[in-house]
Amino acid sequence: VYALVESDTEKEQGGLFVSNDGGDNWNRVSKDHRLISRAWYYIEVFADPVDENTVYVMGAAGLKSADGGKTWSNISGTHGDYHQLWINKADNQNMVIANDGGAAVTFNGGKVWSTQNNQPTAQFYRINVDNLFPYNIYAGQQDNTSVKIASRNTSGGNITDRQWSYSAGGESAFLGFDPNDPRYVMGGSYQGTIELLDTHTGEGVGVMIHPVQYQAMQPKNMKYRFNWNAPILYSKHEKGVYYHAGNHLFKTKDMGKSWEVISPDLTTHDTAKMGISGFPYTNEGAGGENYCTITYVMESDRENGVIYTGSDDGLVHVTRDGGKSWTNITPKELGEAVVNAIEVSPHDPATVYVAAHKYKLNDFTPFAYKSTDYGNTWTKIVTGIPYGACVRVIREDDTRKGLLYAGTETGLYISYNDGVSWINFQRNLPVTPITDLKVHKNNLIAATQGRSFWVLDELQPIRSFDASATGKLILLPMTEVNRVSGYSIFDSNGEEKAKYPNTTAANPATGAVLYYQLPDSVKSLTIEIKDQNGEVVRSFSNKPKSSNSNNSFRNEPVLTVKKGLNRFAWNLRRQGMPTIDNVYIEGSYAGRKIVPGTYTVTLKADGVEQSTSLIVKADPRINTSAAEFSAQDELLAKLEKDVTDIHVAVTRMRGLTKQIKEMVKLVEQDNSKSEVVTMSNNIVKKITAWEEKLIQPKSQSYDDVINFVNKLSANVIFVHGELNGNVPYVTAGQKARYAELHAEWLIYQKELDELLNKDIAELNARCKALSVANVILPE
């Protein structure tokens, strides 16, 4: 039997003990400090079920002893901070280890472990976002660096580790920066350390307010006390100003070179709770145990000088003059609690929300409050949130007043009546603690404690929900969209679930997403998109469009007509170009994207219409003009028309050829019709020769394009592909090449006209004279 014992660290009495007689007698076999140095956070011992002399200890390092605990070696190959180990009783070479980075499996006794990079198990703290495009999400990640990750990959379909980078500070960082120019990021870590990171150079400097090595110190002896997750924020009103909180609130105007104290101690300053952590045995002085500290700071974005603070010992304060004077506005019934988040309403400067919890006191009651008078009076708003769902954060929607989102210990809740009542809104979100929420650019971003970041990409269905309007026809308002590159599984309109690697996240949809609510039994449904001139740029229906010689509708998406909410994604492209059967052409048949502007989207359901506006903007990173978009659109339209005309003509002539051959089969045994047979065979040869100037019939597969010379339509599609990008960039070469190809097509059009007006006309005349059915050019 092995026992890992924490004891008085000053007397060196702890360590690993072993009993060989079932616990009657014990001997200490190791006093290695690594085994017991952080007993508050972890120390777990595991005996091998097969080999009595093999024992494992989980701590900052994973340790293994093969001699009954006398000597130790590190378990390598995975993350640090180990908490748990499972050993297969039937095969002790098979183990599963758990640490702050996830879990790993071994089948050879720990020589090799499986990767942990395929597990979305990050524990994130507080969220911040910038206003770049695509915007970035920032947060501190437990037992790792702070993180910055893009909300979209504009060069692919998934957000991968290439869109990720480290940011300022450490694992427990709040991150502050100018959201419009986030070059300089201020990030914290435990015990009040702060880094100012220049993201352009990658260089960081320390700007700690009072650079003292606080670790192992009693909080009551510290000059300033900082929470493990000490707040840092960039001012919404004063350019270049950052705030940082310990037990006081601090302000810097010179990038951290100097700090001004702008508040008294905003905690209870209860010195009885500022002694040695881990008492009475092991001093745990890492910083996570500091008490009487400020846990949250919120600067009002509606009023300059209005700042709220919350502390881990249950106090809420406000200043309305930039810190000159402070008022204790703590809700009377709150008591000792961690004030975890504060939200100022984006719609009313006097309305403020507070989220608090007491789970550290073994009380899992949800606590959330609302005030409409700057905190003078409070109303508790937790109806519908059950016991156990401790509230960590509340955010109000920045578009719909009174729509609230609550992140709790067990998931997400929403309220449509300003907190009077709440409903669970979990959907596919894992049941996991939500540590922070942020409403940004039509997205709801969630930081979780163990399941990484989650983003709800499209908030308009939630914002537009009206319980009294269920069963009615509604076309939901649309949000602004940007023309972007990349793609997404959410561009699909199918019911199937697209798969992507679990080491990545799916992009948000790359076009416009339309939501519409339908009553029962809608039979006919269409969506029509018009530009500012009233031209229809695209239309869709719930019924597949019929396809003739122009088969561009072959893969046209179809609108769903289910009762309730329906979703339809449009990629902002016009109708695609028709294809040619049994010919491989390297290139895309996709139509061009619409130019930035305002469009009208009209939904028609069984004769009833509703319309809304769609604003399409350029990628803000692209420095271009409306004239350049128009020039691109104009040339692409010409190229698309030529491809369409060529492929429709070829398809129709193929249909005509088929008729001629079928007619020949019927009359070729009749000598009196031999002239018709001869004329028909000659015409088929002419049509084939004409077609082979337009397409390459020998091109049947991908590699054929390097074996057989491209013909006219492939050359036009190539120019179209060169130009049909997100950036409007029309070159002289593209215009000249179009002119050459168009002139070539005009020649072949004349040949086609001659075939139809002379050869086919003469054939039909001879057929009529000989009582043979004539041939008809298909539609």
Regions found by a protein language model. Give the residues of each.
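Short acidic/polar inter-strand loop motif in beta-rich domains
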Residues: 576-580, 604-612
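Extracellular Ig-like/FN3 beta-sandwich strand-entry sites
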Residues: 565, 594-598
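Beta-strand-rich binding/interaction modules
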Residues: 195-197, 514-515, 521-540, 598-602
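Low-complexity, Pro/Ser/Thr- and charge-rich linker/hinge segments at domain boundaries
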Residues: 461-487, 613-647
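Beta-propeller blade termini and top-face loops
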Residues: 1-500, 509-510, 543-545, 554
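Contiguous beta-strand segments within globular domains
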Residues: 489-526, 530, 567-569, 640-643
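Mature extracytoplasmic or organellar-lumen-exposed domains after removal of signal/transit peptides
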Residues: 605, 612-614, 645-779
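Glycine-centered tight-turn motifs at strand-turn-strand junctions
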Residues: 536-590
